[in-house]
């Protein structure tokens, strides 16, 4: 609904076949429901409007049907609007897998005024998800001889760390007031464009590391999916990875920033205990 005033004039003379709800969770069952829908099958282009799970569902449906996909990001919580992967879950919210798509969305629209009016926790979590990209990419690519695309992607990933710390607090303040500011635009662009560009450019081996693996593992705990956002949980994994890798300077910067904006800095922030062996989490994280 928030996009309607912007979307209607942009569509011009295009015929909207039908509006379909994707199903609330990025599951293969919901993808199948879309691909089997006669109206979806006869559409020339699929337009996904929403957050990451909606867009990942529509992207995979378009991939299976061989149809181009346009994404409209109504929140800035992940880079799903740009990437050519879909993160898929089971119906209970636990992580399933990450299918690679044949192509990225043909276009991504970023209505900053809509994102500014969205619940602020999505932007907050998106900041956490974005910072992980630089930490994971540089770690995974370390000491490798990179081709041009991967080197370019790794270079772009630097936009996902220091600039996010520099603009993050002011961006969240603007979003709290539902105002579009330069800082907010910088953060939205880094969450969606910088992170998404890295994902598209680098070799798949460099796209993720411990921070996201820990998130996928933690999805086996029901309360994680119920009470916590993707980027929120990933942000804790970023601290764990920096500690594991001995990157003390970056760890201190990230930790201080997390404390400043309220991102997790300890297990208790994710309703977990240091006495919990996390054996089920680690088993899933290793997959």
Report the location of each language-model feature.
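Solvent-exposed alpha-helices and their adjacent loops that cap or buttress functional pockets
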Residues: 38-41, 62, 97-103, 107-108, ...
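ATP/NTP phosphate-donor binding region
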Residues: 1-44, 267
């Amino acid at each position: 609904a928030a996009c309607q005033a912007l979307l209607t004039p942009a569509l011009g003379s295009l015929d909207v076949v039908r509006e379909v709800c994707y199903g609330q969770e990025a599951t293969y069952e919901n993808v199948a429901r879309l691909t089997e829908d006669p109206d979806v099958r006869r559409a020339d282009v699929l337009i996904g409007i929403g957050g990451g799970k909606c867009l990942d569902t529509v992207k995979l449906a378009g991939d299976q049907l061989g149809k181009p996909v346009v994404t409209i990001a109504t929140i800035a919580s992940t880079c799903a609007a740009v990437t050519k992967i879909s993160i898929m879950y089971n119906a209970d919210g636990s992580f399933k897998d990450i299918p690679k798509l044949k192509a990225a969305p043909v276009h991504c629209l970023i209505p900053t005024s809509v994102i500014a009016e969205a619940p602020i926790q999505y932007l907050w979590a998106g900041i956490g998800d974005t910072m992980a990209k630089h930490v994971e990419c540089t770690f995974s690519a370390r000491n490798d001889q990179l081709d041009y695309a991967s080197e370019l992607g790794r270079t772009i990933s630097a936009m996902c760390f220091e600039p996010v710390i520099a603009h993050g607090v002011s961006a969240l303040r603007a979003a709290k007031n539902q105002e579009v500011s330069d800082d907010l635009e910088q953060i939205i662009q880094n969450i969606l464009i910088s992170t998404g560009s890295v994902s598209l450019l680098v070799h798949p081996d460099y796209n993720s590391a411990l921070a996201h693996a820990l998130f996928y593992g933690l999805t086996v705990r029901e309360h994680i999916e119920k009470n916590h956002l993707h980027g929120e949980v990933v942000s804790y994994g970023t601290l764990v990875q920096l500690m594991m890798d001995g990157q003390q300077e970056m760890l201190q910067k990230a930790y201080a920033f997390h404390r400043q904006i309220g991102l997790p800095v300890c297990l208790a922030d994710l309703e977990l205990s240091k006495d919990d062996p996390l054996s089920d989490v680690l088993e899933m994280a290793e997959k």
